[in-house]
Amino acid sequence: EKILIDYSEMFWKKHDEMMAKKFGFEKLERYDADFFTSWQKLMEEISTDYTLFFSQLESLEEGSDIIEHFKNSFYQNLNKDQETLVIEFVENYRQRLSYNQISKEDSRKIMQKTNPKFVLRNYLLYDCIAEMEEGKTELFDKLWNALQKPYEEIYPEFSVKRPEKYEGVVGCSSLSCSS
């Protein structure tokens, strides 16, 4: 039982340390676990592409239109209540970021080292397999190259949401327990 308790504590400590880096925080603060939980709830509420969200968070500037800035990471149009949730979250994020002792640029560098620009997505594998069955290897070669440097945006065409044609396709828009 002690092993399970220790594992749980260690897991959540490492999780929170990783999340702090994803958000560009130089160190964990006392209430960061609550901040991460509120972010997770928001992402679930508004159906967001996490990879794109963090990429856009890196480039968020003061004074920018928050909803417009993040709209490419949302899988649906947001209603006013959802927009308010996003705006409030970003305000909380900026407040939390102000606790950093490092520069905004150093914070951004932490984010860039932690948040990949490329994540191999199942729909890309579907397309790659289909092409390879036709004897083509162009997509395979691009995927291979992108996998070698996931923290660099080598192919901007991979930095997009899952195409609508894959909505509802098991393994592309949702995963089963056996996936």
Role assignments for model-derived ranges:
Residues 1-179:
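Regulatory N- and C-terminal appendages and interdomain linkers associated
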